Amino acid sequence: MAIASISSPAPVASQQSTLVTEPPLTSSMLLTQVGSVLAGILLFILLIAWLARKLGFAPQAKQNKLLKVVSSCPVGQRERVVIVEVDNTWLVLGVTAQQITPLHTLPAQPTNDSSSTGDTKPVDFNQLLKKVLKRPEKSE
């Protein structure tokens, strides 16, 4: 058996291997590649932070005990009417991008704490996703 394997020529000699080598990366190519990856990661982090804030997952700032927003109602794209409680007095304010105008003053009234805008609980993501993905049925 050993003699038969010695006498037969190996087909390896007829095949030649060709190695394709890539040119080495220059410093400018490497810097561009690393910079673009870093910029992509930063944009991804900013996008996640923006989504967390919009969906209500970001922690809310501590409430100021001297000033409490009782209610708020948008009346335009950047205009809103806000009721603020200060020293047992409700101030009805008109708020725009340029100014805040006092509209009316009322004595403070007892409010339901659950309806207060400052005590809103964060929305459950699962419920929010189901609400967004729910498609209205078409009626013809």
Curated annotation (Swiss-Prot):
Point out the signal peptide segment.
Answer: none
Question: Chief subcellular site?
Answer: membrane
Q: Where is this region: Disordered?
A: 104-124
Give the bilayer topology: Single-pass membrane protein
- Segments crossing the lipid bilayer: 31-51
Which keywords fit this entry according to its UniProt record? Bacterial flagellum, Cell membrane, Membrane, Transmembrane, Transmembrane helix, Virulence
State one Pfam family annotation: FliO
- Write down any Gene Ontology CC term: bacterial-type flagellum basal body
Instruction: Give me any GO biological process, just one.
Output: bacterial-type flagellum organization
Spell out the PANTHER family in the cross-references: FLAGELLAR PROTEIN FLIO (PTHR38766:SF1)
The entry's protein name is Protein MopB
Encoding gene (name): mopB
